[in-house]
């Protein structure tokens, strides 16, 4: 990512090289000799304690999340036969609280001609009658990606254990100039004022990503619109998501989710904007825009303030992909799920017997100023908090650090706030850095002394600090005398293992730090995951790490400051986290 065309070309080459190292697995490169080798042993040393994952084998995209008859449902892409991608079906789990999960029988699996070579990602739509419907991408005998529908066998069953696929599938074929090998991941459908249902399917034409729009009166026959809902020159769009969010100026309850069914109310419709999120197959990042949607013309126009390209805002600046949101009617909120892939190697995954987790489900809403989305772990997560320690008003001078003791940090929730009294020592900010936070983080890592910062946490650290994952802030001074805050997750020293992929992840934080000279950081630590939320959820970064020494009781937590300006930890609350019921069979 860069501002100059020539530099952008170099970065593009680098991204391709990066993909060759690790991302190809996320792009579903097939290992025929490995995909059906069942794990005989599951190595639990680095398995997460409270993040969602099945007992063994490969998982990827979250699919069809919904709430039905008192239960949260999550389907997800799963290989029942091995720890690499292949044999994909929709595994199915249910929960009453988004924390404890029970595994059920697979919801959708290859069983018909129209999906005999795979059941890929999709979404759930709850019809006005209360009937839930799954729409998903099937791979047919000709390797075409087609869109199919499935209905519950028994609507009185809150577990929705069985699904049937009507014979009139596929309901959408890749006709009319659509690339049959790049046509997948249908969205949740929405009902328009003209009596038509609408949904999007991700696709591309050359390097242009497309959100292809389809309409239907009966949810059976779907007709392609003359134009996509939206497009941009970013490469293939996977896992599109399109949904309304409340605007603060129009509602006192702007943090609530908005159900598309409510949009028939004209007053509600005037108080919302729309979010279009896409997952970029080329870079394996996601980005989103916020804008206006015209129901009459079926046009979506992003607000000018939102970059409509791969420099755009992201849900998460780390290892977070193929996200899918849903409206939770029980608590009137929108929740987003995201897949966190492994960063180790295929042999490592086979040895472990598992690969992939889901990020902690997050509540999502539009910020009060309308400039970005904000995310925060669902409130139910607090039920797992156990032993607690607290630190207050502790000043850290340049080059100093302290250990947070009295609890086990390897599976923990750490919520803290920093105060910076003196911002005068902030380094000058080069405007060219604005489009490449990751490169800036890599250049100015946690061990590079600065003016204001770097300051933050060393998580999953060994006692001698030779292994550690840094989560930190660094403050710069811009030409207009405002301040720019950089947030980084730096795993370059996270493990003695040399063959794993350890990129720095970073994003800028939209906060006026000069106003109150404070910034908050919450970090969820879970054996091989460091999931951080800066400035109360304005910037989120998830990192996968694989320490060799900093495991179990040998994992430590430190707070550090390598900046000239003193930093005060005004408050730090840390909790050990209990292990919930995680996908044991009913």
UniProtKB/Swiss-Prot annotation:
Catalytic residues of the enzyme: 61
Domain of life: Eukaryota
Gene3D superfamilies to which the protein is assigned, alphabetical: Exo-inulinase, domain 1 (2.60.120.560), Glycosyl hydrolase domain, family 43 (2.115.10.20)
Reaction catalysed by this enzyme: Hydrolysis of terminal non-reducing beta-D-fructofuranoside residues in beta-D-fructofuranosides
Keyword Nucleotidyltransferase: no
GO biological process: carbohydrate metabolic process
Localization per record: Secreted, Extracellular space, Apoplast; Secreted, Cell wall
PROSITE patterns, alphabetized: GLYCOSYL_HYDROL_F32
EC number, as in UniProt: 3.2.1.26
Disulfide bonds: 441-488
Annotated residues for binding of substrate: 58-61, 77, 85, 120-121, 184-185, 238, 281
Enzyme class at the top of the EC tree: hydrolase
UniProt keywords, alphabetically: Apoplast, Cell wall, Disulfide bond, Glycoprotein, Glycosidase, Hydrolase, Secreted, Signal
Keyword Disulfide bond annotated: yes
Assigned GO CC terms: apoplast
Major site of localization recorded for this protein: secreted
SUPFAM superfamilies: Arabinanase/levansucrase/invertase, Concanavalin A-like lectins/glucanases
Similarity comment: Belongs to the glycosyl hydrolase 32 family.
PANTHER family named among the record's database cross-references: BETA-FRUCTOFURANOSIDASE, INSOLUBLE ISOENZYME CWINV1-RELATED
UniProt protein name: Beta-fructofuranosidase, insoluble isoenzyme 3
Naturally occurring in which organism (per UniProt): Oryza sativa subsp. japonica (Rice)
Classification of source organism: Eukaryota, Viridiplantae, Streptophyta, Embryophyta, Tracheophyta
Gene giving rise to this polypeptide: CIN3
